[in-house]
Amino acid sequence: ENARETDDLPRQGVKKKPKAKRKPKKARPPHKPQRILRTVLSSMKHSHEFGAQIKREARRRRFFEAPRKAFVGDGLPSNWAIHTEHFRDFTPVLDFTHAVTYLFRAAQLCASEKEEAWSIYARWMTSTWRGQVSEVIGELRAHQQRLGLPPDDAADDDPREQLRLILGYLENNRGRMHYDQYRRAGLPTTSAWMESAVKEINYRVKGTEMFWNNPDGAESILQIRAAALSDDGRLPRFLARRPGCSLLRRPPRHLQAA
């Protein structure tokens, strides 16, 4: 017991070496982009009218004055119709995550084994990320020749029909898939943040047991929801100025009667 007690005591004449000070780690720049200000638009209007709304908001945000401008979207034709009509000077970028979902399905169609399909998918995904989508399309054309063209009455689950649709998607968006150039220019390559905002809107308008028999009511809810998700305080400003607000100063009665 005495031995154990003396072992716990500091030894006389023995100096402990000072611990080496660790060099402070250099602060690395954040990899993910930081959101500065988000404004959200939502409407049941036709894409022609909605495109004009987007343009007005972009002008208000002074996006047209930016030295680098990008218009990111999925393969929906109406998105690129809006780009052509209102944002022609913006670099068109197909959302990379949408592109790879088509590549994944194409790899499943072109390979019989899961491991082989994954290997093909990884190679095509890498080539597309490097801006070499033309090579991927060439390989898919070769696979299409092997499978054959679909008949006119082909079912939706026919592999030949699915491959035809995938090739059409890639061909139509080939000019919006120069991801190597976009990365060098510092442009975004995905609309994931916008997809997240859409889900936040859907939580309010597409929830359980929600039915919109009145389109005007749905439009009003969409406007309020979009304003609530915006960072510029547009919803509090609207509520403070709306008719009937308790904080709003009412005009004199003689003016009300007039």
Q: Where do the PLM segments sit?
A:
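Catalytic center-proximal scaffold of phosphoryl-transfer enzymes
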Residues: 1-258
